[in-house]
Amino acid sequence: MIRSMLYATDLGLYAPLVMQHALALARTFNADLYVVHAVEPMGLFAESVLQSYLDERALNEFHSQGLNTVIANIEQRVHDSFREELGGEGEQDLERIQAVRVLQGDPSQVILDQAQKLSVDLLILGSHSHGAGAETPLGRTAARVLQLAPVPVYLVPLAERRRRGDR
C-alpha cells in the first residue's frame, strides 16, 4: 500500500513533467507527498574565490545566512511551481504536500536519506537531469537511487527521448 511518496526534483527543464506524475500518483493513491531538492556543496574553486574577496567574518556570515537564504528561496520556488502547475483548482492537491525540503549534499544520498527518514513507500524522480544527453541511458543520480533504494522507484523517462522514439 502506498501512503507516502518522495518526489525528488532537480528543478530542471523536465521538472514540471515529473511533478505532474508525482501529483497524479499522490491523487491516485490518496497519498502524502514530500518534495526534496538537493543542492550540491560548493566546490573548492568557488570556496577559494569567496575567500579571496571576503574576510573570515563575512565568509562565516555568508555560509550561515547566505545558504539559508538560498535554500529558503529554492523552497519557495518549488511551492510556486506547484501552485502554477495546479492553478486555482488545485488546493486539495497542494494539501497533499507535507513538506518541501532543500538539503545540501550529494543528490542521490540526500534522496536515499530522506526516503529512510520519512519512511516513504515510493520514490519519484526523472531519469536524467536537464544537463544529461539523450544518449545516456540513465543519469548518475537516478542510477544510484535505483541501485540503493529501499522502496520502489517510479522513474519518469526523459521527454526528448520519448518524443524521438528512442528506447
Residue ranges of model-derived segments:
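Short, flexible loop segments at boundaries between secondary-structure elements
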Residues: 151-162
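Short secondary-structure boundary segments
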Residues: 37, 127-128, 157-158
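Short glycine/proline- and acidic residue-enriched helix-loop micro-motifs
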Residues: 57-73, 94
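Structural beta-alpha unit
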Residues: 1, 72, 76, 80-123, ...
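Small/aliphatic-rich secondary-structure junction motif
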Residues: 1-64
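Short, well-ordered secondary-structure micro-motifs
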Residues: 18, 45-48, 112-113, 136, ...
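Glycine-rich, Arg-bearing micro-motifs that act as flexible, cationic patches
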Residues: 122-147, 162-165
